Amino acid sequence: MKDSEIRKAVREGYGKIATQGNSCCAPTTSCCGGAGIAEAVSKTIGYSEEELRAVPEGANLGLGCGNPVALASLREGEVVLDLGAGAGFDCFLAADRVGKKGKVIGVDMTPEMVEKARENAANGGYKNVEFRLGEIENLPVADNSADIVISNCVINLSPDKKRVFKEAFRALKPGGRLMISDIVLLRELPESVLNSVEAYIGCLSGAVMKDAYLKAIKAAGFKQVKVVEETTFPIECMANDPTAQAIIESSGIRREDLSTLGESILSVKVSAVKP
């Protein structure tokens, strides 16, 4: 697929999620926990009950693969930039930590997501959070303006990950930090999955090898690049997800082989510093 086709597919896929409330990367029935699937998935990947209760209703769509805010060591007064902010879940958690003197900027390329995030911010009474429409490869933020860049299961969706990391580097102040949670590969995916549009939207075929991912961060200029945590991605929990069903149908993968495919996939939490 061409880069423009990938972006169009991702934008349309996440636009539907914003309006329908279904996760592309999480189950919609009882595979991972029955009712309140977004909440169940979020608990599985590291969010506490307190964090889930602290955000406006509808902010958590169950789209993440980790909890970057918990690992970011945010301080009062800091400026936080969230790449691929979605409905604002991590932004709202970050806003509580940086306080009234701080600021959180969420960037997303999907108009429906930005609209939903702004509605959530208004409903929650957040004054220190701003959502901007834009691509993470071309961030609508000034140079040297953020203290920390966070992102949660989004950069894997970009067809130009090197550009994303360069943009994150540009946006950070000297001494600024990067803390991201994302999906990477331990081994190459089957060709049928790599060529699946549905798999790309579902956070699968856009993922790259772990070493290549870390090299891209270093190539952007970051130092102290460190994998803080890594866990296997519970892809078998996608068996009832509409996107997962589309992946199965379009790629020919048998449902029972999903867990085997999951052995190729990691959720990693990576930190780095702009010197």
Predicted regions and their residues:
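Conserved SAM/SAH-binding beta-strand->alpha-helix loop
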Residues: T110-E112
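A short acidic, Gly/Pro-enriched loop at the edge of an enzyme's catalytic core
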Residues: E76, E137-I148
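Conserved SAM-binding strand-loop segment of SAM-dependent methyltransferases
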Residues: G124-N138
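Short, glycine-/aromatic-enriched active-site segment of Class I SAM-dependent methyltransferases
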Residues: V184-L204
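C-terminal lobe and adjacent flexible extensions of AdoMet/dcAdoMet transferase-like proteins
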Residues: G15-Q20, C32-G33, K218-P275
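Conserved alpha-helix/loop element of class I SAM-dependent methyltransferases that forms part
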Residues: G34-V79, F89-R97
